[in-house]
């Protein structure tokens, strides 16, 4: 980006938003407002990612299907060999993206992630952008797009890699955010998930059962009483 700006490429714009309202969702909505209205797709990549320069060219063809609103690549990681705990984290992530996402993709029910994701701009604007009140704005957006009839494509090819949490404390913060966000989504989308007005049975199944493990310990306590 710095090199392109230095060469006078006016298509490249950089914004630094410290302590922005709405956190990542708020920053993404800010960026969307400053994106060229003619842009057909919106790509989201986390700041710690190293991205293959051929990523966009490799996956953009899936948007030839006008029903596709999301094209998602795996959330892959690098530099995880430093400790046994980091290796275990990477193995867990790999299991989800190598196995779980394939099962969900068969039912058009993938979990959209906040990195290595490409979104059709028309679908994103139709959904009014990211929900700044949800702590997992990426997954919540994906579910809203499914509810609006859009489809998603999962491309199981690594086009970029980021960093795993640095230690156990960072891992706990990540899991707390995921668990809290899952409960927010279940509460806000309960009507669609239970009655399935616009969702298929497969989508309802995966989004309901996929988040039940977050409350598994509480259910074990209830069932043991």
Segments predicted by a language model, with ranges:
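Long helical/loop segments within the catalytic core of UDP-sugar-dependent glycosyltransferases
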Residues: 4-40, 53-135, 146-147, 168-208, ...
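Positions that flank functional sites
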Residues: 78, 139, 160-161
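Catalytic donor-sugar/metal-binding loop of nucleotide-sugar-dependent glycosyltransferases
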Residues: 133, 142-160
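Active-site donor/metal-binding and catalytic loop motifs
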Residues: 156-170
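Membrane-embedded multi-pass helical conduit in multi-pass membrane proteins
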Residues: 213-225
